[in-house]
Amino acid sequence: IEKSFHFHMVPEWEKEIIDYAKHPFWIGLSEWGDIEHIPNFYEFKHNKDVVDSNRVGFAARMETRKCPHFLQGIDSIFFTDVNDVKWWEKNINLDTSMWRTYNYKHEHLDMFMKQNWGISHSAHIYEPFGYSIFQAVDWGKIPILAHDWLPKYDYPFRASTPEQFKEQYEKICKLSLQEKRDILFPLREHLKQWDNKEQWRDRLLEIYNE
């Protein structure tokens, strides 16, 4: 994709907001710059076994930084705005013939997560936290991650281009159920360090009450 935009790509805009704020802080996965960092949180409520399916799921907005075009030609199921999918078809000439799309409604989230898909397209760039990644892992889906998301964690399936994504997808398709468990379960345990809602709440209250 030649044209993409995200505020993280405009340091001047970010600096202006930081300078304007009385008490700037960053809520995300990891520290960013010199700003005070308050880790975000995700509560693991499902802890599902691995879904042994090679269909890929995409549960995100159709932003350029989410890289939906990585899924051209791959059997996939989408949970997003159908009108945004049509925009990609019209303006980017995206081939969506291998996709099945469910229009996003929050109340249908559990229904979508229960569908028979076992691989999550989680290779999103400039991802500040990655709530949908945590969600996929919670529901037993093997994620394909971007190289810049939790880079210190030794994870075998990462992609930054459509070609890399397809390569990682094909590797996952060859795994046995137990091999998938050996990948997903340690990742889930690692992510549970961001499962502390009380810490997040208490630190925000301290700032708001200053």
Identify the residue ranges that each predicted region occupies.
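A short, active-site helix/loop in glycosyltransferases that binds the activated sugar's phosphate group
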Residues: F7-H37
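Short beta-strand->alpha-helix junction loop in the catalytic core
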Residues: L29-K48, N83-V85
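Conserved donor-binding/catalytic core segment of Leloir-type glycosyltransferases
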Residues: N47-K66, D75-I77
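Nucleotide-sugar-dependent
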Residues: E63, H106-E107, I119-S132, L145-Y155
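Conserved active-site histidine-acidic residue motif and adjacent donor-binding/catalytic loop
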Residues: N83, N91-Q115, H124-E127
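Short hydrophobic beta-strand element within catalytic cores of glycosyltransferases
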Residues: D138-A146
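A charged, aromatic-enriched C-terminal amphipathic alpha-helix characteristic of glycosyltransferases
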Residues: E163, K174-N209
